[in-house]
Curated annotation (Swiss-Prot), chains A, B:
The keyword Oxidoreductase applies. It comes from the Archaea. It comes from Thermoplasma volcanium (strain ATCC 51530 / DSM 4299 / JCM 9571 / NBRC 15438 / GSS1). The glycine cleavage system is composed of four proteins: P, T, L and H. In this organism, the P 'protein' is a heterodimer of two subunits. It catalyses: N(6)-[(R)-lipoyl]-L-lysyl-[glycine-cleavage complex H protein] + glycine + H(+) = N(6)-[(R)-S(8)-aminomethyldihydrolipoyl]-L-lysyl-[glycine-cleavage complex H protein] + CO2. The gene is gcvPA. The lineage of its organism: Archaea, Methanobacteriati, Thermoplasmatota, Thermoplasmata, Thermoplasmatales. Its EC number is 1.4.4.2. GO terms for molecular function: glycine dehydrogenase (decarboxylating) activity. InterPro entries: GcvPA, GDC-P_N, PyrdxlP-dep_Trfase, PyrdxlP-dep_Trfase_major, PyrdxlP-dep_Trfase_small. Gene3D superfamilies: Aspartate Aminotransferase, domain 1, Type I PLP-dependent aspartate aminotransferase-like (Major domain). NCBIfam families: PRK00451.1 (NF001696). SUPFAM superfamilies: PLP-dependent transferases. This is Probable glycine dehydrogenase (decarboxylating) subunit 1. It is an enzyme of class 1 (oxidoreductase).
Amino acid sequence: MDEISSMLDYLGIKSTEELFSDIPLSVRKKEIGIGSPLDEHLVLERARKYASLNSTEMLNFLGNGIYDRVIPEAVNYIISKSEFLDSYTPYQPEVSQGMLQSIFEYQSLISDLFKMDFTNASMYDGYSALGEAARMAYRINGKNKILIPESTYDSKLSVLKNYVWGLSMKIEKYKMNEEGKIDIDDLQSRIDGDTSAVVVENPNGYGVIDENVFRISEIKKESLLISYVDPISLGVLKPPGEYGSDIAIAEGQQLGIPMNFGGPLLGIMSFKADYVRKSPGRLIGESVDADGKRAFVMTLQTREQHIRRAKATSNICSNQALLTLAAGSYLSILGSSGLKKVALLTIKHSKNLAESLGNIGIEKVFDSISFSDTLFRIDKNVMLDLAKKGILGGIKLTSLIKDSKYSSGTFFTATEKTDNEKIKALVNALEVIM
Amino acid sequence: MDEISSMLDYLGIKSTEELFSDIPLSVRKKEIGIGSPLDEHLVLERARKYASLNSTEMLNFLGNGIYDRVIPEAVNYIISKSEFLDSYTPYQPEVSQGMLQSIFEYQSLISDLFKMDFTNASMYDGYSALGEAARMAYRINGKNKILIPESTYDSKLSVLKNYVWGLSMKIEKYKMNEEGKIDIDDLQSRIDGDTSAVVVENPNGYGVIDENVFRISEIKKESLLISYVDPISLGVLKPPGEYGSDIAIAEGQQLGIPMNFGGPLLGIMSFKADYVRKSPGRLIGESVDADGKRAFVMTLQTREQHIRRAKATSNICSNQALLTLAAGSYLSILGSSGLKKVALLTIKHSKNLAESLGNIGIEKVFDSISFSDTLFRIDKNVMLDLAKKGILGGIKLTSLIKDSKYSSGTFFTATEKTDNEKIKALVNALEVIM
Amino acid sequence: YEEPIIKDIKSSNTFSLSEQVDESILPENLKRKDLELPEVSEYDVVRHYTRLSQMNYTVDVGIYPLGSCTMKYNPKFADRVSAIDGFRNIHPFQPENTVQGALHVMYDLQEYLKKISDMDAVSLQPMAGADGEFTGILIVKKYFEDKGEDRTEIIIPDSAHGTNPASATMGGFDVVEVPSDDKGMVDLEALRAAVSKKTAAFMITNPNTLGIFEQNIEEIAKIIHNAGALLYYDGANLNAIFGITSPGLMGFDIVHFNLHKSFATPHGGGGPGAGPVAVKSFLKDFLPVPIVDFDGNSYRLNYELKKTIGKVSSFYGSFSILLRAWSYIIRNGDDGLKNVSARAVLNSNYLKKKLEKYYDIPYYPLKKHEFVLSTENTGKRALDIGKYILDNGIHSPTVYFPLIVKEAMMIEPTETVSKADLDNYADVLIEALKLSDEELKSRPKNTAVRRIDEVKAARDLKLKW
Amino acid sequence: YEEPIIKDIKSSNTFSLSEQVDESILPENLKRKDLELPEVSEYDVVRHYTRLSQMNYTVDVGIYPLGSCTMKYNPKFADRVSAIDGFRNIHPFQPENTVQGALHVMYDLQEYLKKISDMDAVSLQPMAGADGEFTGILIVKKYFEDKGEDRTEIIIPDSAHGTNPASATMGGFDVVEVPSDDKGMVDLEALRAAVSKKTAAFMITNPNTLGIFEQNIEEIAKIIHNAGALLYYDGANLNAIFGITSPGLMGFDIVHFNLHKSFATPHGGGGPGAGPVAVKSFLKDFLPVPIVDFDGNSYRLNYELKKTIGKVSSFYGSFSILLRAWSYIIRNGDDGLKNVSARAVLNSNYLKKKLEKYYDIPYYPLKKHEFVLSTENTGKRALDIGKYILDNGIHSPTVYFPLIVKEAMMIEPTETVSKADLDNYADVLIEALKLSDEELKSRPKNTAVRRIDEVKAARDLKLKW
């Protein structure tokens, strides 16, 4: 007798239909309408066909949040291990030490990279992490105003707005100067007794590396400093912990995670130790087991939704554990020297790119140092024409910030992969198009 | 101090150059000449570029030894696990039970599928396994003649010749009848006191399922019966153990191994228990450990080269362990019902293919049942023209057996994937070409 | 073995990029002082994580019957689909004509989710189940804002997942809890009493966290809708009812899916997940943007929803998870999905019957895909029994949830486990009762580490090396 | 835990192909009676092998210093290359114009192997190292047949790999063994005495299995060539001399490579390997067919070698292994390969020095990539110490080989292990000496199983379930 029959027998029923007798006939479904099952190899055939309709062999100058970077294959190997991939949230730590230790190491690596005290075990992406940071600031100081740079992209602002909507917080933009950096005077004038947090970006939404962010802690008064950074840039740039950040946020996709059409991503959140009990999400702590042996475990769960319910510091349940593993293994493989090299090459390539475009009369909008994304003055929308030539790039600033005054602003992005050959191909294509 | 410096210090030397002081200057190499190291991502870029020059999205009607079959992704998952992939020959069985048990299961699954007593832990490929079988036959009965069907492909014959060359054995072809099956009379007339083994194929080199192979054990006299079979066909066909085979050989690629441009492959060898001590290669046996617990271990190693050296039954060292894992997991996932379905669909599709080509006037060479490969009468060489239309197929028999009398013979191959849509595309293409 | 932390491993960095670059490219004032990441070989990193992997339980090693978490076997073909370069290496800002395959998959998935749920429009953007809830809450909020109604309360059953109240709070709503009745279903009288003009929505899981189907769901819908409020479906348990009924048929207005649960995408040790949200047509314009449209010719990202709440995450959702769910759905088709639910419910009821002589299994007896037992009648603690289970090489159930059952163990076998697995699991649970309290409290002892001092973890708070 | 054999696992088959087919398509007389493969779910198969995988040591878990086996870390990018669909899914009979990328890789690899070895022509066809040896032996045989000389003997040093004599015998040659001298090198006098008109070839590894470079290699070549015989290079230890010297410079006529050893392709638990053969120009025409040629425009399979031995395997070799080796070679380049050998030799000599105070390490003191110690002076058995090593979570060396060293342990650290690994390994080997014989004989005890009754395995001969 097959297993289903013998189970039905044991239950004293004739078919599984009977197990659904509690479902009112009035809500019964006729059919789903998806069709017949498709054999596994035909699923793969269809997937390969669809995938072939996506262009991946193009030269990539896209960025502004998602970057095409070198990912050591060992990172893919590690996150593909089913012992990690097909496990669940480590609710039973005795059999989950692998994941727990790897997250603890992620927390440590990011804290070292950011020079911050603590790092949580992940948010969904940089944008939602910024939203959570604003909520956290509110929990810390109860104030209502968030100041953000004018270079904040509309989509990021939209996510932030949604996160603070329930708190009725107010979001206000401060100005940037002609170098594309923080207008300190303008910002200073907006900081008042109701200011919960000042958000700074480095590099900012214009792609500019902004040393003015280092001075904000001096002028922020009672408010908190939330720094939104590029984690790769921290291979050389001053880290948020060195300039008085209270909370530091980043999008972690660049740390070993494929672009994947923009998801899943990794929201990084680090903060000062004092604020840990106000922090959202998950934390892994070190402790000992019954034999006194080092062991890792989820801690401060009393802040979390499964314990605290309506009073939790966030609703986070599934977060981005596997991607912390990617980031942790990426940072471990690159090491200080590797990450520094990647960051410096990025700056070098951005410089090469600007010089090469400059040679054909395409000027930078700002006379400042860019990290990955450089904003050029190009009136025409060149993106579709470039795509026809096998090149991806040319995002208009106005597609990211609708009412930006830099209406000719057009982005081209460099990473450590953007060698001179690729830049030359872009220059040649632009010469034809423009 | 970095690790290299401190090791050099410990050795009391200044550089690793000194460690090569024993190598005469007269044989010193100047440079290798391969060039500079290539960054990992550029290696992948180059590999992807080259791979894109191979056509994989074509409709595939190629076979004659290598087949494009459904491989459950779980098989790829299993053989990609680095715990198997990056391990070595299980010389230390206490830490290699995973591989040992999996090979033991492979031996068992194949023995059940073939209905033979024992199966060894792999040969390189079907052809070399046939060569080893001939040598084994010689070790068993000391006789000199091997009889093989006229439908044996030249490449297989060449490998066989090389394997028995050192033994000075004689290889003789026997005839096939007008149905493409063994000419029993001819074969019978060739079997004499010096005949070491009769090799039969089912399906044979013409693609034909040949019931005459079932009768050979009655006429083979003192010689051994070596059956070369298609392991997928055994999902429905009578297995070698049911018709008195002494040794059964197969190419195992079809059991979950990608085509990989023809390698690596898997040589399957099963045999009667009596002959085990004359068998080549590796064997895994069940035993117990010091606690009486079941344990697996390499056994009868005294036949092997690392112990017996010049008197070993073969020179096999690295064999195809990982591919036995593929075959074992493939057979376990498909099960009896799955393998039967695959075999029956193959026959059905071959029949559909023959009918469809028949409808446009392309006739089969033999009025017999084919398994995967069907031989058609087509004078023209259609292969390159078909390739231009995105179809792979049309191997000329004379490219496999140079002096075959069936000079118009042209193969088209079906598998469980060869649905009517694909057959229709072939028919349409052939109508244009012919 | 004890695996050192990566910082304590000593070797030499082997990562390399051959192009040279001069540090002076960046002015000193912008530079960091120092950087202290590990400098080890790739081999050491691979070994480190390989060893850690062997200290981690996975559904590929054994069954994982965590209630409500739906830890079924994740088929490998779906991983393969998501690994295809043509899907992995595309940038979200690529022109639409260069990502038609990706948009096609997303469009199809939207359609499939609509058919499965009988809802009218879908956004794939939320990044996890809880994020889907939050998105749903924002839609509720925007809907009433748009209508000019000031509704401040979300009603939630006492058996609900913790994410429900947490999400409601994030949206600025007050949470009103309603009790369950003696069948483990929503107490209709209590619900009627709780509903008012302040009620914005009622959030409910069906079948609920007790594994019991809320048979009064139509009445519930009527109560909620009559009050002018919205009915929200927490899709965590959707895998119990594929093809049998649907949130749309039951009268729900907003639904979130947990693709990683229902459609077998890997849980990744705690994410990433994917939490699409579906709504009835009158709420379509409130969905986050973009959604994927098809004009008969090509697929495009539609940002033009009139009353959209905007964005809840950076781009278009957890694309690599969406891919896997899409693969799973087309692989299964109608028949396959129906079988998923039938077998999940069969397994649950079979295991429940095997255990009911030993453990108290409260409330309505017919279960769906999961059930909750209480160890209270046995005198043993759920926690201790859970730890004993670990010692048997299998994973324990969810413990101490839902809160309305004392010493609760919430067991969801899922459809991919065999009868032999269930028999074995039952044996272990029954065997546990024969052990002394002392013995149970000493468990686990066959695991990588033994019981962990959680108090110390919270007190000393060591969150980095 | 003890993992059952797959046959003993009970569940239901989940494999499916939806197309229907009638059994009557095949006449009864052709059919088999019954078929008894397992009928289990894919999930159960995946679990089974996942569990088995955790009972298997791998280089990704720890170092694997098996002498002559060259178990270095296999970089993951090479696996990725071999997994690209454009390489995996091509058929060997595809027209050449549809496989130009594959042929390009093979051509490049032929060229690289020529440059590394200073030989003139390469066949990639042999499927493993021993198969390469057999191929080389066939070339020797054919060469003398072509010359009309009847040479029946192959000379082999007593320190040689077992495959050397076995391969020679397979080719129908008689094996003549020559002893090593007191430096662990070929005894030149003995070699001179052994050489005659019957000598077809001398097969030798350099550095040899003692890890010692044969410093008289030029004299050896002269002796062999003066006798009209051929000099054969067993490439198992080629990884010690990349860029320093080469078989071609040393005077060898035929070389086989072990790509899986020298160029870090995974060993697969005992295969597949790849054993290309290279020859000097005067032997090119004897190579197996086809080889890959380039006409300046496209790549083609050349079957037209005049005196070819024909074929030694079905098609063109272990293509997926060739791909990995190609990747490894271009990744490393000249500098990388030189560093591979330098570090391998450094590691070997470092470990040797750490151990020489405790163990007898005979023969010439300067080692290459590996060395052989003897436990004889310690009074312990090599086997016992090996088993103790396993208990420390690391793999033991090759034991009882080469045969000319009593109680031999042959240790090849490889270049990918760190100083910390070597220090730890030395500590374990030194620690072992402090244990009593009894204690050592009780090892291992921390492994999945303990010492296995090999006599029972051979006597009862249970080779199937």
